[in-house]
């Protein structure tokens, strides 16, 4: 269950950073700055979460290739 809490925790941190940047964005080109930084944070979170969860719960179990055939499954 630690994977759920890790992903949710990182999501909360990224969301807080997005809200903070929404409030503190520079005044010139504010829409460009907001969309660039918030979309960057969102995409980085998605890539991290997908990679983290794929490594935590792989679809194909790893197999050892250095075993003798009689000990292999």
Curated annotation (Swiss-Prot):
Subcellular location: Vacuole membrane
Keyword Transmembrane: yes
Residue stretches spanning the membrane: 4-24, 36-56
One Pfam family linked to the record: ATP_synt_H
Annotated GO CC locations: fungal-type vacuole membrane; Golgi membrane; proton-transporting V-type ATPase complex; vacuolar proton-transporting V-type ATPase complex; vacuolar proton-transporting V-type ATPase, V0 domain
Subunit and partners: V-ATPase is a heteromultimeric enzyme composed of a peripheral catalytic V1 complex (components A to H) attached to an integral membrane V0 proton pore complex (components: a, c, c', c'', d, e, f and VOA1).
Protein name listed in UniProt: V-type proton ATPase subunit e
């Amino acid at each position: 269950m630690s994977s759920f809490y890790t992903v949710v925790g990182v999501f909360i941190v990224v969301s807080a950073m997005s809200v903070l940047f929404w409030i503190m964005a520079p005044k010139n080109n504010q829409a460009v700055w907001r969309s660039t930084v918030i979309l960057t944070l969102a995409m980085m979170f998605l890539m991290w979460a997908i990679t983290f969860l794929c490594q935590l719960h792989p679809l194909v179990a790893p197999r050892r290739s250095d075993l003798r055939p009689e000990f292999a499954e």
